[in-house]
Amino acid sequence: MSLITRVLQGNLTRKNALQTLTRCGYSSHAKFAEHRPIEKIRNIGISAHIDSGKTTLTERILFYTGRIAEMHEVRGKDNVGATMDSMELERQRGITIQSAATYTMWKDTNVNIIDTPGHVDFTVEVERALRVLDGAVLVLCAVGGVQSQTLTVNRQMKRYNVPCLAFINKLDRLGSNPYRVLSQMRSKMNHNAAFIQLPIGVESNCKGLVDLVREQAIYFEGENGMDVRLDEIPQDMRVESQERRQELIEHLSNADETFGEFFLEEKPFSEADLRAALRRTCINRTFTPVLVGTALKNKGVQPLLDAVIDYLPNPGEVENLGFIEREGKDPEKIVLNPARDGKDPFVGLAFKLEAGRFGQLTYLRCYQGVLRKGDNIFNARTNKKVRIARLVRLHSSQMEDVNEVYAGDIFALFGVDCASGDTFTTNPKNNLAMESIFVPEPVVSMAIKPNNTKDRDNFSKAIARFTKEDPTFHFFFDNDVKETLVSGMGELHLEIYAQRMEREYGCPVTLGKPKVAFRETLVGPCEFDYLHKKQSGGSGQYARIIGVMEPLPPNQNTLLEFVDETVGTNVPKQFVPGVEKGYREMAERGMLSGHRLSGIKFRLQDGGHHIVDSSELAFMLAAHGAIKEVFQNGSWQILEPIMMVEVTAPEEFQGAVMGHLSKRHGIITGTEGTEGWFTVYAEVPLNDMFGYAGELRSSTQGKGEFTMEYSRYSPCLPDVQDQIVRQYQETQGASQPDKKKKKN
């Protein structure tokens, strides 16, 4: 029976109950909501590949810091589930679907935590969490090592310049090898990384850790590993500890000039010097400290919390920029003031929207100033005013009211009409905005319809809510086939939303077969000179545009660009937006397969206008005509999404697995083997990956598993393109276009 359960059932006296809860570290919400100086604030995320133990680690952190009074498991037998997995679907499936925020305290430092999903289909949750965090804990499985989503998270951290600690988890699992994981971090992720802890035994012999910084052994004893005992390093580990400590010193010396002087001049240095070098290099992203443990067995969590405080930055050590728009000039960069004194105007960034019990909940990070209940703020994008009626801080699905928030705090507001990535400020006149959030393009589409026509209202409400909350979930109606389609990052992504429609809105839906989001692009430049002229009595329509459409480089083949290169007044500037609008409208549907255009630059170079008959509408229609001209005269090809696939299975099935990947047009990029298992890495077209899960199970006797994530768009094979074009033409009731219109 847990301590808190005994308290609730009255098995302890009031005095003993207080002592018991205090020993647990359990504290009231007020303790965590106290205002603290900026040096005592940490904003961290916990990110990793799926099933690496992120949520279990967060549960232990909350317990050891006194935020919760008892621990629950991700797949707990008590039907409670982990604190941060508040959605029923998360608890059923044992996976994290939405990022969840909480805040706690460790050694007088306020730690704001965002636990993120590990599945590639929910990668936007990681993206927007990392955008507003100052540091992160990258969790790696001691068995699985660096996996596909680990690489994705690593790229996201690099994009937002987020310093991180690495925590090699699951030391207790059969086959765990933290030394192999460190080697993968260096080779696959290009991290300058070294252990600052070593395991005392692995698998069933996992007893504790060796701290290489303080040169002591750490053991976790008592109920739930709450008693941390320091001791001498075991005799049989002293040689290895010295070697690994020397390796740590060498890696730090290469990354930090100040510490390098100690090493080169062979000067003695203190533990404080070593810690200072670790902090400097970690914040500068030139070194990654590697810690070890097993969250499930309650080992290594408290030293990880110490490392978060010691080595990850506070909000004042991270430079955050705002941009002030100047008409006709490049935006002016402004460094935001992170001081928690409220002297500067409030600046905050909305990074997540969620429909709560009391209306829309908007998650924000405060970057400058202070925000109090009753204040007015403005959305920098829409210039709409919002009055703050209620301020809350989040503990998973629980909301805790606060009166004010300061720079560095993560909080939420109710009833704010905005989008992810919007900037809010108290001064609407300075046109200040922060850099928004990168949103990947959806790669899979499915037809969707409610099972019962009476549920259409609820279906519409669900779609409206989910598309607003999740920028990677798209909805549209295809007029050609008269189908409603949803697009997302993968089959699981769309299946989860279908299940949520039934659970949360009482609207069961049927999903069709998945469809790949192909794209169409130009093979080479194609010039155009189009005149749109219409006269039917009264004022007519007149617009002429001259220019060229050309392909963008392969690394930009998901973008569409419009460039106004006109000189003089042949195309008046007030009509140029009409040309761009017409271009982007026509880019929604290509000629070969009906898919969107991408990887194209539209260069408007010249044209002509009529003083009476020209208008923005006329130039928009001229753009329509010009693109139809390019459809006919240009050489086109179809692009398809390529996935990075990682398959792990017993060695005896390696030939079968690689054979199946080759049949699916996969290109093998690497293989690894260890202790009877192998891992193969391949790039495979998404169109060829449907049904692979069943094939892998049958060919490996159910022992194989795979993950995949989006890599890039690449031209289709000629026979694949012919098949796609033929299928599209059949649905249009037309014959296949002239072969000259497309190039493979």
UniProtKB/Swiss-Prot annotation:
InterPro entries: EFG_II, EFG_III, EFG_III/V, EFG_IV, EFG_V, EFG_V-like, EFTu-like_2, G_TR_CS. GO terms for molecular function: GTP binding; GTPase activity; translation elongation factor activity. Residues 725-735 have a biased composition (Polar residues). Gene3D superfamilies: 3.30.230.10, 3.30.70.240, Elongation Factor G (Translational Gtpase), domain 3, P-loop containing nucleotide triphosphate hydrolases, Translation factors. Residues 725-744 are annotated as: Disordered. GTP binds at residues 48-55, 115-119, 169-172. It comes from the Eukaryota. Pathway: Protein biosynthesis; polypeptide chain elongation. One of its GO terms (biological process) is mitochondrial translational elongation. CDD domains: EF-G, EFG_III, EFG_mtEFG1_IV, mtEFG1_C, mtEFG1_II_like. The keyword GTP-binding applies. It is found in: Mitochondrion. Keywords: Elongation factor, GTP-binding, Mitochondrion, Nucleotide-binding, Protein biosynthesis. GO terms for cellular component: mitochondrion. Residues 39-316 form the tr-type G domain. It holds the Pfam family GTP_EFTU. This protein may be expected to contain an N-terminal transit peptide but none has been predicted. Belongs to the TRAFAC class translation factor GTPase superfamily. Classic translation factor GTPase family. EF-G/EF-2 subfamily. Mitochondrial GTPase that catalyzes the GTP-dependent ribosomal translocation step during translation elongation. During this step, the ribosome changes from the pre-translocational (PRE) to the post-translocational (POST) state as the newly formed A-site-bound peptidyl-tRNA and P-site-bound deacylated tRNA move to the P and E sites, respectively. Catalyzes the coordinated movement of the two tRNA molecules, the mRNA and conformational changes in the ribosome. This is Elongation factor G, mitochondrial. The lineage of its organism: Eukaryota, Metazoa, Ecdysozoa, Arthropoda, Hexapoda.
